[in-house]
Protein backbone atom coordinates (compact mmCIF):
# COMPACT_ATOMS: atom_id res chain seq x y z
CA UNK A 1 0.00 0.00 0.00
CA UNK A 2 1.17 3.48 -0.81
CA UNK A 3 0.18 6.68 0.96
CA UNK A 4 -0.41 9.68 -1.28
CA UNK A 5 -0.69 13.26 -0.13
CA UNK A 6 -2.37 15.40 -2.76
CA UNK A 7 -1.92 19.03 -1.80
CA UNK A 8 -3.20 22.10 -3.58
CA UNK A 9 -0.29 24.51 -3.48
CA UNK A 10 3.28 24.72 -4.68
CA UNK A 11 6.49 26.66 -4.05
CA UNK A 12 6.59 25.83 -0.34
CA UNK A 13 9.39 27.28 1.79
CA UNK A 14 12.49 25.13 2.26
CA UNK A 15 11.72 24.38 5.89
CA UNK A 16 8.38 22.82 4.86
CA UNK A 17 10.11 20.56 2.35
CA UNK A 18 12.79 19.63 4.90
CA UNK A 19 10.23 18.78 7.57
CA UNK A 20 8.10 16.78 5.17
CA UNK A 21 11.12 14.90 3.80
CA UNK A 22 12.32 14.07 7.31
CA UNK A 23 9.19 12.02 8.03
CA UNK A 24 8.73 10.51 4.60
CA UNK A 25 12.25 9.07 4.62
CA UNK A 26 11.51 7.37 7.96
CA UNK A 27 8.56 5.44 6.55
CA UNK A 28 9.08 1.77 5.67
CA UNK A 29 9.07 0.73 1.99
CA UNK A 30 5.63 -0.88 2.33
CA UNK A 31 4.15 2.47 3.44
CA UNK A 32 5.92 4.97 1.23
CA UNK A 33 4.51 8.49 1.15
CA UNK A 34 4.30 10.25 -2.21
CA UNK A 35 3.48 13.95 -2.46
CA UNK A 36 1.53 15.16 -5.48
CA UNK A 37 1.32 18.93 -5.66
CA UNK A 38 -1.68 20.46 -7.41
CA UNK A 39 -1.23 23.92 -8.87
CA UNK A 40 -3.79 26.23 -7.25
CA UNK A 41 -6.32 28.09 -9.36
CA UNK A 42 -6.09 31.86 -9.49
CA UNK A 43 -8.85 33.78 -7.75
CA UNK A 44 -8.63 36.69 -10.18
CA UNK A 45 -11.18 38.30 -12.45
CA UNK A 46 -13.99 38.01 -9.93
CA UNK A 47 -14.00 34.20 -9.89
CA UNK A 48 -16.08 32.79 -7.09
CA UNK A 49 -14.68 30.44 -4.46
CA UNK A 50 -17.06 27.78 -5.81
CA UNK A 51 -15.63 27.95 -9.33
CA UNK A 52 -12.06 27.87 -7.99
CA UNK A 53 -12.82 24.81 -5.83
CA UNK A 54 -14.56 23.07 -8.75
CA UNK A 55 -11.55 23.65 -11.02
CA UNK A 56 -9.19 22.41 -8.29
CA UNK A 57 -11.42 19.35 -7.79
CA UNK A 58 -10.89 18.41 -11.44
CA UNK A 59 -7.12 18.64 -11.00
CA UNK A 60 -7.28 16.61 -7.78
CA UNK A 61 -9.41 13.92 -9.42
CA UNK A 62 -6.93 13.68 -12.29
CA UNK A 63 -4.09 13.17 -9.78
CA UNK A 64 -5.91 10.60 -7.60
CA UNK A 65 -4.57 7.06 -7.91
CA UNK A 66 -7.21 4.69 -9.31
CA UNK A 67 -9.12 2.83 -6.62
CA UNK A 68 -7.48 4.71 -3.75
CA UNK A 69 -9.24 5.27 -0.45
CA UNK A 70 -9.98 9.00 -0.30
CA UNK A 71 -9.29 10.82 2.97
CA UNK A 72 -10.24 14.47 2.60
CA UNK A 73 -8.86 16.92 5.14
CA UNK A 74 -11.44 19.49 6.14
CA UNK A 75 -12.04 21.72 9.15
CA UNK A 76 -15.47 20.11 9.61
CA UNK A 77 -14.15 16.55 9.41
CA UNK A 78 -13.95 13.93 12.12
CA UNK A 79 -11.44 14.59 14.85
CA UNK A 80 -9.25 11.48 15.07
CA UNK A 81 -6.61 10.86 17.67
CA UNK A 82 -3.21 9.53 16.70
CA UNK A 83 -4.27 6.18 18.16
CA UNK A 84 -7.33 6.08 15.89
CA UNK A 85 -5.12 6.70 12.88
CA UNK A 86 -2.77 3.95 14.09
CA UNK A 87 -5.75 1.58 14.42
CA UNK A 88 -6.91 2.39 10.87
CA UNK A 89 -3.53 1.77 9.19
CA UNK A 90 -3.40 -2.06 9.51
CA UNK A 91 -6.93 -2.44 8.13
CA UNK A 92 -6.09 -0.18 5.23
CA UNK A 93 -2.95 -2.20 4.56
CA UNK A 94 -4.91 -5.45 4.59
CA UNK A 95 -7.44 -4.30 2.01
CA UNK A 96 -4.56 -3.40 -0.30
CA UNK A 97 -5.94 -0.11 -1.59
CA UNK A 98 -3.68 2.91 -1.72
CA UNK A 99 -4.73 5.81 0.50
CA UNK A 100 -4.90 9.38 -0.80
CA UNK A 101 -5.00 12.21 1.73
CA UNK A 102 -6.22 15.42 0.08
CA UNK A 103 -5.36 18.92 1.31
CA UNK A 104 -7.43 21.61 -0.39
CA UNK A 105 -6.48 25.08 -1.50
CA UNK A 106 -7.08 28.42 0.20
CA UNK A 107 -10.86 28.10 -0.27
CA UNK A 108 -10.96 24.47 0.87
CA UNK A 109 -12.21 21.40 -0.96
CA UNK A 110 -15.11 21.23 -3.37
CA UNK A 111 -18.28 19.88 -1.67
CA UNK A 112 -18.62 17.08 -4.26
CA UNK A 113 -15.13 15.82 -3.44
CA UNK A 114 -15.83 15.93 0.29
CA UNK A 115 -19.11 14.07 -0.23
CA UNK A 116 -17.42 11.16 -1.98
CA UNK A 117 -14.55 10.88 0.52
CA UNK A 118 -14.25 7.62 2.44
CA UNK A 119 -13.13 9.63 5.47
CA UNK A 120 -13.55 13.34 6.14
CA UNK A 121 -10.82 14.17 8.63
CA UNK A 122 -9.89 17.29 10.59
CA UNK A 123 -6.17 17.50 11.34
CA UNK A 124 -6.58 20.36 13.83
CA UNK A 125 -9.22 22.65 15.25
CA UNK A 126 -6.81 25.52 14.61
CA UNK A 127 -6.30 27.19 11.27
CA UNK A 128 -2.93 26.14 9.87
CA UNK A 129 -0.86 27.14 6.84
CA UNK A 130 -1.32 24.53 4.12
CA UNK A 131 2.38 23.72 4.01
CA UNK A 132 2.40 23.02 7.73
CA UNK A 133 -0.47 20.56 7.25
CA UNK A 134 1.78 18.51 4.95
CA UNK A 135 4.44 18.27 7.65
CA UNK A 136 1.94 17.49 10.42
CA UNK A 137 0.24 14.81 8.33
CA UNK A 138 3.53 13.15 7.40
CA UNK A 139 4.58 13.19 11.07
CA UNK A 140 1.27 11.70 12.19
CA UNK A 141 1.48 8.96 9.57
CA UNK A 142 4.98 8.12 10.77
CA UNK A 143 3.85 8.21 14.40
CA UNK A 144 0.83 5.99 13.62
CA UNK A 145 3.08 3.48 11.88
CA UNK A 146 5.54 3.56 14.81
CA UNK A 147 2.68 2.74 17.19
CA UNK A 148 1.71 -0.30 15.12
CA UNK A 149 5.33 -1.50 15.30
CA UNK A 150 5.86 -0.78 19.02
CA UNK A 151 8.64 1.55 17.91
CA UNK A 152 9.95 3.84 20.67
CA UNK A 153 9.22 7.05 18.67
CA UNK A 154 5.76 7.27 20.26
CA UNK A 155 5.98 7.31 24.04
CA UNK A 156 2.56 8.58 25.15
Curated annotation (Swiss-Prot):
EC number in record: 2.1.1.177
Protein localization: Cytoplasm
A cellular component annotation (GO) from this entry: cytoplasm
UniProt catalytic activity: pseudouridine(1915) in 23S rRNA + S-adenosyl-L-methionine = N(3)-methylpseudouridine(1915) in 23S rRNA + S-adenosyl-L-homocysteine + H(+)
Example of a GO MF term: rRNA (pseudouridine-N3-)-methyltransferase activity
Binding site for S-adenosyl-L-methionine: 73, 104, 123-128
InterPro entries: Alpha/beta_knot_MTases, RlmH-like, tRNA_m1G_MTases_N
Enzyme class: transferase
This protein's UniProt keywords: Cytoplasm, Methyltransferase, rRNA processing, S-adenosyl-L-methionine, Transferase
Superkingdom of the source species: Bacteria
Family matches, as PANTHER family: METHYLTRANSFERASE, RIBOSOMAL RNA LARGE SUBUNIT METHYLTRANSFERASE H
Family: Belongs to the RNA methyltransferase RlmH family.
HAMAP family in the record: 23SrRNA_methyltr_H
Known function: Specifically methylates the pseudouridine at position 1915 (m3Psi1915) in 23S rRNA.
Complex formation: Homodimer.
Record protein name field: Ribosomal RNA large subunit methyltransferase H
Source organism: Burkholderia cenocepacia (strain HI2424)
Gene from which the chain derives: rlmH
Amino acid sequence: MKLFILAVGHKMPGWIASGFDEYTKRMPPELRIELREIKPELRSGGRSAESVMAAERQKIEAALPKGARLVALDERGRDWTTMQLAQALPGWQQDGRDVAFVIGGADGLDPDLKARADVLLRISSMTLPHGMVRVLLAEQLYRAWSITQNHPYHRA
